[in-house]
């Protein structure tokens, strides 16, 4: 039982990190597009 809860919390934490990472990548791509568009 305890292990299952730990696993659930860990998977939730990983999901949140992946979501944040995904958003950061998208932001970087948008930034790159904006900068290349200026030139």
Swiss-Prot record:
Cellular component, GO annotation: endoplasmic reticulum membrane
GO biological process: post-translational protein targeting to membrane, translocation
Cell compartment(s), UniProt: Endoplasmic reticulum membrane
Originating species: Canis lupus familiaris (Dog)
Function: Mediates post-translational transport of precursor polypeptides across endoplasmic reticulum (ER). Proposed to act as a targeting receptor for small presecretory proteins containing short and apolar signal peptides. Targets and properly positions newly synthesized presecretory proteins into the SEC61 channel-forming translocon complex, triggering channel opening for polypeptide translocation to the ER lumen.
Keyword Membrane: yes
Subunit structure: The ER translocon complex that consists of channel-forming core components SEC61A1, SEC61B and SEC61G and different auxiliary components such as SEC62 and SEC63. Interacts with SEC61B.
Chain's gene name: SEC62
Expression across tissues: Pancreas.
Signal peptide limits: none
Assigned protein family: Belongs to the SEC62 family.
Transmembrane segments: none
Alphabetized UniProt keyword annotations: Endoplasmic reticulum, Membrane, Protein transport, Translocation, Transmembrane, Transport
Major subcellular site: endoplasmic reticulum
Cell division is among the record's keywords: no
Bilayer topology annotation: Multi-pass membrane protein
Lineage: superkingdom: Eukaryota
Name of the protein this chain belongs to: Translocation protein SEC62
């Amino acid at each position: 039982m305890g292990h299952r809860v730990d696993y659930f919390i860990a998977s939730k934490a990983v999901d949140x990190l992946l979501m944040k990472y995904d958003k950061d990548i998208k932001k970087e791509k948008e930034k790159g597009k904006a900068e290349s568009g200026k030139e």
